[in-house]
Amino acid sequence: IFAANEGLCGAFNLLLYKKLLETLQEYDGKVKSPVFVYPVGRKLVNDIKRTRGVEVMPIPDLFEKKQYAEGATALADELIRRFLEKDVDRVEVIYAHYKSMGTQIISREQLLPWVPQETKALSDKERNKVYIYEPDCEEILETIYPLVIHSTMYRYLLENQTSEQASRILSMQMANDNAIKLLKNLQLEYNKLRQQNITAELMDIVGGSIE
């Protein structure tokens, strides 16, 4: 699960954590071993540790050093290794998909086993062509497969970081707008009180002059 390292980003971390709880609820009773969670982002680590039915796993130190591309690759390699060794049956990633500055969608996608995306059907002309692969298809797949997982993991990370910054900008903009509105209301209240004080002083002066 990808989250934020810092706060001041609205409900960003909370929504990611809720998505994790929904996922755990789906798995409840369906798996015997605990669900292994790799939390990338300091803000959710303590909450996840207190969550029932999960085992929090360490992530590469590269993330703390802000070497994000290398960290994503190292994490992907760790997940691939555990999957091939049958330590885990399935790997899913929870992250914030960046759609636009005002829209970030909390998503959950399957990383392993990798399912290729559907492509458009080939025309008869293309389908009848014969291709010779060198080296063979199996060797090509063994080389490309990790690269696809690496790039996909890095994409999840970048989208989540972009969504985090967008949420932070929007939160700060809302806070700024609320502060400006509050200042205007306070200024209006101050002007009213000032006018009341001036009126009271004038009434005292006029009353004193009449006497």
Language-model regions, residue ranges each:
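C-terminal beta-strand-loop-alpha-helix "lid" module of Rossmann-like NAD(P)-dependent dehydrogenases
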Residues: 1-211
